[in-house]
């Protein structure tokens, strides 16, 4: 049996869409802007804290060695740039599956880290997650695809429950 978390990474790398959200944006070029770049402030207040940038690295992966390698790279980028990072679902760590693939604050002490678990988890598991991770915030995710089994053949992907 393959590791579902590793499957997520493999599918994300293999099945890519030519579309991205930037396709929906139109940037209007003004060769002589009327604003002072020193007056632009991207900072924001979120989760009880002030942030330099109005975005963060959202939950990606965790729970496997391959996911841990991805998270380590994301943690390094987040730490170096001051961007918050949200780990993948901490549910795997609560089961004892590679909890080290979620928290990189020993290696990157300046890392601002949040974590998430599925909305189907109990309040007790949410409390255990917060106690284990001491995150900036706990994010709940709704993942309708998790109970589905993914099968592939050549270039086709199908989902069954």
Question: How should each PLM-predicted stretch be described?
Answer:
Residues 1-47, 51:
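An N-cap/entry alpha-helix motif that binds or orients negatively charged groups
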């Amino acid at each position: 049996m393959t590791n579902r978390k590793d499957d997520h990474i493999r599918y994300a790398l293999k099945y890519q869409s030519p579309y991205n959200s930037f396709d929906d944006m139109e940037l209007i070029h003004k060769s002589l802007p009327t604003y002072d770049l020193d007056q632009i402030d991207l900072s924001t207040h979120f989760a009880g804290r002030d942030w330099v940038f109005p975005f963060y690295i959202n939950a990606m992966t965790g729970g496997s060695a391959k996911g841990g390698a991805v998270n380590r790279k994301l943690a390094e980028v987040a730490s170096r740039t001051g961007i918050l990072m949200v780990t993948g679902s901490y549910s795997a760590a609560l089961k004892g599956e590679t909890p080290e693939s979620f928290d990189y604050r020993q290696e990157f002490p300046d890392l601002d880290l949040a974590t998430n678990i599925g909305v189907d988890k109990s309040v007790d598991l949410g409390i255990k997650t917060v106690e284990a991770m001491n995150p900036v915030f706990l994010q709940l995710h709704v993942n309708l695809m998790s109970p589905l089994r993914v099968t592939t053949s050549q270039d086709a992907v199908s989902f069954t429950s």
